[in-house]
Amino acid sequence: MISRWKWMLKQTFKKLWFRATLFAIVAIITALLSILFKSMIPESVSVKVGAEAVDNILNILASSMLAVTTFSLSIMVTAYGSATTNVTPRATRLVVEDVTTQNVLATFIGSFLFSLVGIIALNMGAYGERGRVILFIVTLVVIALILITLLRWIQHLTSLGRVGETTAKVEQAAIETFIARARNPCLGGYPWLENNEQPKGTVAVYPKKIGYVEYVDMVKLSKLLTNDPRHVYLVAQPGSFIHPSTPVLYLSQGQESSISTDLLETIIVSDVRSFAQDPRFCLSVMAEIACRALSPAVNDPRTAIDVIGRGVRILSAYAQNKSDEIEVKYPSVHVAPLQNNDLLEDFFSPVARDGASMREIQIRVLKGLSMLSKGWPGIFAEAAQTLAFETLEHATRADHIDSDRYLIKSIYYNLFSGEDSNKKP
């Protein structure tokens, strides 16, 4: 687990304004460095580069980069709208954080500022004869960088905002989150298995804010209890919706004290959920993409089938990286592990419900559950069996012809082979 300031710094790096500002500062410094190093250029070389040559190139760069930046921003906004409409609004955040798009826009803005500062300094006579040579060389390097960026941008535009590309971004973010959680099942804390009721001898701590828990600073939370015999039982995990009427944690031994305020500061609350530290939100977004594809307005079952496959990959990555031995880094903080049945239900249940009338969707759901159940029976078998029967119930009550209904039933009994013979669809 990383500390709060490192997490906030990581989130800042993902912002478009940060990368654009960084590139702009570098561009301005680069343009001004030519003034400092002009003494290194021999006078015999400086006469070969005319002032008009550099000035004309910088003028072309300034005018073209401003137009290209404006055009690229309009494309970016269109891509955001496409992701919101065709995929899900929850996935737009990942499109906004796209590294290639941010680098392209930052390069264009930086090139514009470089040429602008160069023109101003050149007209002021700050470069001199020898400084113009350095400015000319740097300008050629900037032009080469712009050409490479344009080629990358053209290639990237073919997939920006598309359903497949955006879904892949959600899958990648989900896999990273699940692998991190598999390696730290309890966020580094001590497993809290009996989390359905308040532990005896503890006092409830209530939040002052309303919203979703975005991040829990386990490092700071543990440090607050370093020389303290008390323990903390974390109720509100990332993704939980908190309210002043419900406790976010329990503090052992004694009455609620001033430390409660410090404990609450370790929990970052946001208006919306995020992919970091919130595996269930990742699965919910994947399920939402599939459900939107199954809606009558879209009617794209193949996208839903693709999402089911991605969901199986996400859960498989989680199971592959999950260890039976839990490493406890913060023994004074008790955290409940993820419930396997919740994970499967978050993803498969909405898809099975919305795709009840489509034979191919029900078959894919059953096969996906079977793969997870047989691949990691100790993790998914029980939950997969329950959801498979639920899927069969949806199919039985949906408007299927007899042959389709028989096919789905036969696949169910073949894959799950009557593991629960008492249930009758």
Regions found by a protein language model. Name each.
Residues 6-21, 49-63, 88-107, 128-139, ...:
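Membrane-interface segments at loop-to-transmembrane junctions
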Residues 102-105, 142-149, 179, 319-320:
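Juxtamembrane membrane-interface segments at transmembrane alpha-helix termini
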